[in-house]
Structure formats: C-alpha cells, structure tokens
C-alpha cells in the first residue's frame, strides 16, 4: 500500500514540475515578438499568387455547406481565386442540388463528384490534380472563414521558406451546449498557446484541416507520400492534416500560425461524437509523433521538449491517477496530495489563461479536468493499444439518404449545372 501511495505522490509531483516548466516556456514563446519599429514594406510589385480553395465534403448538411461556400465567395483577396468542391461519394446529393446549382453560377467554382466514398485525403488529391494555383487552401465543408482569411494566409506565404500555414480555429456552434463552449476554449488554447509557441520556431506540428494553406511547389513533391501513408503495413486513412504537416517539415519547409486568420467550424455538441473525434486524433498524434521523432534533432530544444514532454506528462498524470485510485480502493485512504496538486494546477492554469485572453469564461475551463482525467486519458490509452485500427469512426455516422439514378462517374463541372453530374458538388 505504501508503494501505491508513494508512486502516486511522486508521479503527480514530477508531473507538476514538468508541466509548470512546459507551460511557462509555452506562454513565453507564444507571445508576439515586440521588435523595433521598421520602415514600411515596399508596395508588392510581383503578381499575387493564384489560390485554389479545396472543399472536401461527405454527407454535409446543405445549410452548413452553403454557409461554407458563401464565406469563400465573399473573400476580399484581389488575386485569382478558384474553388474546387469535392463531393466524396455523398449519399445526400439530392439534398444539396440547390446549393450546387446556386454556386455553379459563379465562374470561380468548380464541382467534382466522386462515384464512391474514398476519404478526405483522396478527395483532396482529386482536386489538387485538376487545379493549378500557386497556393492551395483546404477548408472543411463544415467551416466558415472570415472575409480576409485568404489574404492573410497568402501574405504569410510570401516567404518562400514557408510551406504551410494555418489560421485560428473557433467553434461556430459554441453557444449550443456546455461541451461546445468547452471545445471552443480548448481550440483557443491549442491555437494561441501551443501553435503560437511552435510557430515562433517555424514548426507548427499540425496545420489543422478546417483552414490550412500549402505551397503547391512544396506539396507536389509530397503527394505520393501523402496518398500512400502506411502504418504497420496498412493504409492510414485519417490524420491527414498532421501527417501532411510532418511531411512539410521533413522536406525542410517552415510551418506557421496566423492568429488573425479566423475560421469557425462545427464541433461535437455531445460527448459520444466528441470522444470518437478524440480517439481518432489520439491515434493520429501517436502515429505521427513516431514519424516526427527524427526531426527533433534539427529543431529547437523547446520543440523537442514540446513533443516528448506532452506525452511523458500524460503518462505521469495517468500513473498518478491510477495508483491513487488503487490506493483509495484498497485502503479507503483519500490521496489528498494528488487531488490538491491537480486542483491547484487547474485553478492556476485557468486563471492565467483568463488573464492572458482577458476573458473570464476561461475560469469555466476547470470542467475540462475531470473530462481529461476520467474520459480522455483512458481513451488515449486505448488509442495507443489500437494504433493499427484505421476506422474513421465518424465517416458513416450520417443518415442514409437514397440517391436516384445509376452509378455516377467522376465529373468536374464549372460555372453551370449539367444534367449528367448533378452539377455542383460538395
């Protein structure tokens, strides 16, 4: 019994020290650099890069899809903008005919209909193969982007060393439930602490799919690796965003974060789909962490600490909780030290974030701690034990919608509706 108590106390104490050091460094590096005033940059004389926006869609709600496409159509980008909407074998194509018909009037929009569901990765590649812009922006079909997102991301890509950039994620349905409010805060932390700190060193480890821009010249050399990703000899069909970002870093490109390029995405409003999403992300993170390990030698010491420390920290936290619970069950003795450390660290973290963001709502992020301890940590352990499972988990969750007619062939339409292809896509 003494061993259990000692293990729990030691693990949580080491975890507290590690996390304090990590969070302090993260907050320091996430702060904007205040440099001396510089002269205004000369007016850009080079032609603006052409931007291709790719929107993969599968069984998307017509209203959500329409909002996504409207936000893209309203971009203020003065350069050439083309939009490729890929319907990845959706079963509700008849339900979104009006959406496709409306946007097919805009000559910037093209629609690609795939005859069967092949996954987001192959849907992206289908559009990349039919487009030719200098920059490629992926936008998820359940997301809406602010009017200046393309301009701000493209501006960051003026540096030829930058291969990929991402914007700041928010939850478009943050007001729906307590969980969506929590996820919105989770996104803010992931972007404005983790990604912002990584961006200081030009190595954002995951440019998130709802709003990620890539340099085509960099992307072209990586497509084969991206399309044929294997894990333990089996195709890996999820975690596209993280994997493509790691490939960019391996190829020697910088990946950065643009905090004022705002994208709002629909997030799960109940625990079941949220935990499915977390399981999928955990598997992807573990897989690509192994892939990223050789990169750490050439990156900043902070990034090595970031990659390794996060995983070790979670292991220490899990060890402390498990041994503490075992000690409680076997001796009826409450592990007060473990509880005190976790409670204090939670309160301090939420208070610091509330001050940093200047938003009192982050005090409510204390609710994330029990979810993390009793749901997400066990889920991550399960993910680690089932890394070979490539089930998308959410791909077949949409209701079955009958589609009339025979099997379709992939068709691209541009600017108008044609009877053969139901004309628009996504």
UniProtKB/Swiss-Prot annotation:
Broadest EC class assigned to this enzyme: transferase
CDD domains according to UniProt: CESA_like
A GO molecular-function descriptor: hyaluronan synthase activity
Alphabetical keyword list: Cell membrane, Glycosyltransferase, Membrane, Nodulation, Plasmid, Transferase
GO cellular component: plasma membrane
Subcellular location: Cell membrane
UniProt-listed Enzyme Commission number(s): 2.4.1.-
Main localisation: membrane
Membrane-protein topology: Peripheral membrane protein
Biased composition (Polar residues): 406-416
Pfam families: Glycos_transf_2
Disordered, as annotated region: 401-426
Protein origin, superkingdom: Bacteria
An annotated GO BP: hyaluronan biosynthetic process
Family as reported in the entry's similarity comment: Belongs to the NodC/HAS family.
Function per UniProt: Involved in the synthesis of Nod factor, a sulfated N-acyl-beta-1,4-tetrasaccharide of N-acetylglucosamine which initiates a series of events in the host plant species leading eventually to nodulation.
Identification of the protein by name: N-acetylglucosaminyltransferase
Source organism of this protein record: Rhizobium meliloti (strain 1021)
């Amino acid at each position: 019994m003494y061993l259990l108590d000692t293990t729990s106390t030691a693990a949580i104490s080491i975890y507290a020290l590690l996390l304090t050091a990590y969070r302090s460094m993260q907050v320091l590096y996430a702060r904007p650099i205040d440099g001396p005033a510089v002269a205004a940059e000369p007016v850009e004389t080079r032609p603006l890069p052409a931007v291709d926006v790719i929107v993969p869609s599968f069984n998307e709600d017509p209203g959500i899809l329409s909002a996504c496409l409207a936000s893209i159509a309203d971009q203020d980008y003065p350069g050439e903008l083309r939009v490729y909407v890929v319907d990845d074998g959706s079963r509700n194509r008849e339900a979104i005919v009006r959406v496709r018909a409306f946007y097919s009037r805009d000559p910037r929009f093209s629609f690609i209909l795939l005859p069967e569901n092949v996954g987001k990765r192959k849907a992206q590649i289908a559009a990349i193969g039919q487009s030719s812009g200098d920059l490629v922006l992926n936008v998820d079909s359940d997301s809406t982007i602010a009017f200046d997102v393309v301009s701000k991301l493209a501006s960051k890509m003026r540096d030829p060393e930058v291969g990929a950039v991402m914007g700041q994620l928010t939850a478009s349905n943050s007001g729906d439930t307590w969980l969506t409010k929590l996820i919105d805060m989770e996104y803010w932390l992931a972007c404005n602490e983790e990604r912002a700190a990584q961006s200081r060193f030009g190595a954002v480890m995951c440019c998130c799919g709802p709003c990620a821009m890539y340099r085509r010249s960099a992307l072209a050399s990586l497509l084969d690796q991206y399309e044929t990703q294997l894990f333990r000899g089996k195709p890996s069909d999820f975690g596209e965003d993280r994997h493509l970002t790691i490939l960019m870093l391996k190829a020697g490109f910088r990946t950065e974060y643009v905090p004022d390029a705002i994208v709002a995405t629909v997030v799960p409003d109940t625990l079941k789909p949220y935990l499915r999403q977390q399981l999928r992300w955990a598997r992807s993170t573990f897989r690509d962490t192994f892939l990223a390990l050789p990169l750490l030698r050439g990156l900043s010491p902070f990034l090595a600490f970031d990659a390794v420390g996060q995983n070790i920290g979670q292991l220490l936290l899990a060890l402390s909780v498990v041994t503490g619970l075992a000690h409680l069950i076997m001796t009826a003795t409450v592990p007060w030290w473990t509880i005190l450390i976790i409670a204090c660290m939670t309160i301090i973290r939420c208070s610091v974030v509330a001050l940093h963001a200047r938003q009192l709502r982050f005090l409510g992020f204390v609710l994330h701690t029990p979810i993390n301890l009793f749901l997400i940590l066990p889920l991550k352990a399960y993910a680690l034990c089932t890394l070979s499972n490539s089930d998308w988990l959410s791909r077949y969750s949409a209701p079955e919608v009958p589609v009339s007619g025979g099997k379709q062939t992939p068709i691209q339409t541009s600017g108008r509706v044609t009877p053969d292809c139901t004309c628009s896509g996504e």
